[in-house]
């Protein structure tokens, strides 16, 4: 869908896509884009990014101040060029041609600028005048043909304008008449939903992705330190944490390596391992972070451990292994439903999310662990890690925890009735109004029928094992009048997916259309979904998220596919949203990738989302990021080359003589080649054993399981979330 400049313009406006973050550049894809045919148009600017809403009033090209491709600086440049041209005209010609010239110059601001300048059709010359509809062009040529030489230095257009208006207008014709000016302004279909997130006929929101990391072994968590460095830390289930820098590179040496302590296995579905990571809100000052992992104690008893650690004073990208201080250990009666989320609330307290202890149906005791307030399993715990407690505890229980005065209840409990919440997040709140700030969202994995999304409330009972989603699971407990459970904000059946992965409310800068959407997914089905709250009735509406077509995602660096198994979601320090997924969910298989969400329909105004990371010294070698996923442009190139080979083969087959030159020599078709790349993850020494816009006239050159897991036993197969 895109086209760059010819080589002499490399490094100019159209060789880069500055709207893409993390240094993703469109590096003069002359050959590639020269192979791509005409595609259906979509809103796109001449820098190949989506249009935007200008932050300030446009004084000159005011038709596009609500939505388009110009900010105030570009608007002023266009106005200056207009007045330079108008100096050549007397008053009569000024009145006759002024509007035409303004209209033509301002098409650079149109949300369809790339189409008006035919910047997408790489098989036709790139224009330096926009495509004009025939009637408008004829009127312009008839009244103002002397202005053409002032608008363009293209020889073909300059030669044609003095002779024949028909020829001139033919040169400015567009293949698709809907996109010529001024028709493009009158087309209801093209303008009805302009600037909104694109939807397919089924109402599925169309987004695109950018690959930012790969070769990871079941990446279960990606977090930032909140210290202004804009690094992100990616934890693998096996127990290794890697540092990624703002330029997209990864440090060769891991931030933390606990492989020798973390309990996990290579078999698919093992939920144990390194499961959670959170940085202290005052990390910049105290260097503290917290981890959640599975382990064996000295007696070989399986436990989950929450520890405090510090970053090395000698290297800000290395943890001090000697600094580990165990905060809490909880014995696990089974090997699944291990929970794993750690986060800090706006109150500064740490929230810990534990699973119900495992097996199917929470069979422990009369009403299970989740409903038992004397057990720490199946709970949301809230503790103060800044102060020590009584009896040698390395944390203090906040005095306003809901059950501190209830006999028999553990005082650290904040909420209960939880099966196995997998991935929770704190809402940053609306960037302007702060609405929603501090809410905690979680995805709770279901048993046999339903997956659910919950809002965590103080003292809330989330129903398990009495209920699963909105439905009864244990009928006796379900009909107990004292249950008084908090219902999910959304639940879905197993026809949609069998293992929910909780996400985030988008509060970033780069994709303003997504603000307020809670984006989450399902591990087993690989589906991406979004919830949006109706502020009037407080109900949540669900919409599916689809990865856009070759039309909507044909931007530099964007892809429209992802690995199936969605393990986790993440938010960077700027608030942009990502998800972590793998094609083979084994803790030892380096098949995991990280993807960033991109809205192709609208971006933030240029410069709004820029930030300057706090410098961080690095001792370890930086490994540049090399994407493995094929971009939409890669796929379009392949399709075009395949069609060209097929056409050439058909031509040769229809008559051998046609394939010979006058000298009788034959032309050979180049055969495509392929290469195999061994996927090697960071720190992996061995491959894991895993299963089956130039001047006118120039051209530009299955895994299946029940309840989200593959399990070694029938009972476990019916129990909890698939990895981790």
From Swiss-Prot:
Gene that produces this protein: HHIPL2
Record flagged with keyword Lyase: no
Major localization class: secreted
GO cellular component: extracellular region
Superkingdom of this protein's organism: Eukaryota
SUPFAM superfamilies named among the record's database cross-references: Soluble quinoprotein glucose dehydrogenase (SSF50952)
Sites where a glycan is attached: 480
Protein name: HHIP-like protein 2
Similarity comment: family membership: Belongs to the HHIP family.
Signal sequence, renumbered to the chain: 1-41
Keywords (A to Z) from UniProt: Disulfide bond, Glycoprotein, Secreted, Signal
Location within or outside the cell: Secreted
Gene3D superfamilies: TolB, C-terminal domain
One Pfam family hit: Folate_rec
Disulfide bond sites: 204-546, 208-553, 424-442, 509-609
Region (Disordered): 643-724
Bias kind Basic residues: ranges: 683-709
């Amino acid at each position: 869908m895109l086209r760059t400049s010819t080589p002499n313009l490399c490094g100019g406006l159209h060789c880069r896509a500055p709207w893409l973050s993390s240094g993703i550049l469109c590096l003069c894809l002359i050959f590639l884009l020269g192979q791509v045919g005409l595609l259906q148009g979509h809103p796109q600017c001449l820098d190949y990014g989506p249009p935007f809403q200008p932050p300030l009033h446009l004084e000159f090209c005011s038709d596009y101040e609500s939505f388009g491709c110009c900010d105030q600086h570009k608007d002023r440049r266009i106005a200056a060029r207009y007045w330079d041209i108008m100096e050549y005209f007397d008053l009569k010609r000024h009145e006759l041609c002024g509007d035409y010239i303004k209209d033509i110059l301002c098409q650079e601001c149109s949300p369809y600028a790339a189409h008006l300048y035919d910047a997408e059709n790489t098989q036709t010359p790139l224009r330096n005048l926009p495509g004009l509809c025939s009637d408008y062009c004829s009127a312009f040529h008839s009244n103002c043909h002397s202005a053409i030489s002032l608008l363009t230095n293209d020889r073909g257009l300059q030669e044609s304008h003095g002779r024949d208006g028909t020829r001139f207008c033919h040169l400015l014709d567009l293949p698709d008449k809907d996109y010529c000016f001024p028709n493009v302004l009158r087309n209801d279909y093209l303008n009805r939903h302009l600037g909104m997130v694109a939807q397919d006929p089924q109402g599925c929101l169309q987004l695109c992705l950018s690959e930012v990391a790969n070769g990871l072994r079941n990446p279960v968590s990606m977090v930032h330190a909140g210290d202004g460095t804009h690094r992100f830390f990616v934890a693998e289930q096996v127990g290794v944490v890697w540092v990624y820098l703002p330029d997209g590179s990864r440090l060769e040496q891991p931030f933390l390596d606990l492989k020798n302590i973390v309990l996990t296995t290579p078999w698919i579905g093992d939920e144990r391992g390194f499961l959670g990571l959170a940085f202290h809100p005052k990390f910049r000052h105290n260097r503290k972070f917290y981890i959640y992992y599975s382990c064996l104690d000295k007696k070989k008893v399986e436990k989950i451990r929450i520890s405090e650690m510090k970053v090395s004073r000698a290297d800000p990208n290395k943890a001090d292994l000697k600094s580990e201080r165990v905060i809490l250990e909880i014995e696990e009666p089974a090997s699944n439903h291990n929970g794993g989320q750690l986060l800090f609330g706006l109150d500064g307290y740490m929230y810990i999310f534990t699973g119900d202890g495992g097996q199917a149906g929470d069979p422990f005791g009369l009403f299970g662990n989740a409903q038992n307030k004397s057990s720490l399993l199946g709970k949301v715990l809230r503790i103060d890690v800044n102060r020590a407690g009584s009896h040698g505890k390395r944390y203090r229980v906040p005095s306003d925890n809901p059950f501190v005065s209830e006999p028999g209840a553990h005082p650290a409990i904040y909420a209960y009735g939880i099966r196995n919440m997998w991935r929770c997040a704190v809402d940053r709140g609306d960037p302007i109004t702060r609405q929603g700030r501090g809410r905690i969202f979680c995805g709770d994995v279901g048993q046999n029928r339903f997956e659910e999304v919950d809002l965590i409330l103080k003292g809330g009972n989330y129903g398990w094992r009495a209920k699963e989603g909105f439905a009864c699971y244990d009928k006796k407990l379900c009909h107990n009048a004292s249950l008084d459970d908090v219902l999910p904000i959304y639940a879905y059946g197993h026809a949609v997916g069998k293992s929910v992965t909780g996400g985030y409310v988008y509060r970033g800068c780069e994709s303003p259309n997504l603000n307020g959407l809670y984006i989450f997914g399902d591990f087993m089905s690989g589906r991406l979904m979004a919830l949006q709250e109706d502020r009037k009735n407080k109900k949540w509406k669900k919409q599916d998220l689809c990865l856009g077509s070759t039309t909507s995602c044909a931007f530099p660096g964007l892809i429209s596919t992802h690995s199936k198994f969605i393990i986790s979601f993440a938010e960077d320090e700027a608030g942009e949203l990502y998800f972590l997924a793998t094609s083979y969910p084994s803790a030892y298989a380096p098949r995991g990738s990280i993807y960033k969400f991109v809205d192709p329909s609208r971006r933030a105004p240029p410069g709004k989302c820029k930030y300057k990371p706090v410098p961080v010294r690095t001792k370890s070698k930086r490994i540049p990021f090399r994407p493995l996923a094929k971009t939409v442009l890669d796929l379009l190139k392949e399709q075009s080359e395949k069609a060209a080979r097929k056409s050439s083969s058909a031509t040769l087959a229809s008559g051998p003589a046609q394939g010979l030159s006058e000298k009788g020599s034959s032309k050979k078709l180049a055969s495509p080649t392929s290469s195999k790349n061994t996927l090697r993850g960071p720190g992996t020494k061995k491959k894991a054993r895993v299963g089956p816009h130039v001047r006118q006239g120039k051209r530009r050159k299955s895994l299946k399981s029940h309840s989200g897991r593959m399990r070694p036993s029938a009972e476990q197969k019916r129990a909890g979330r698939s990895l981790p």
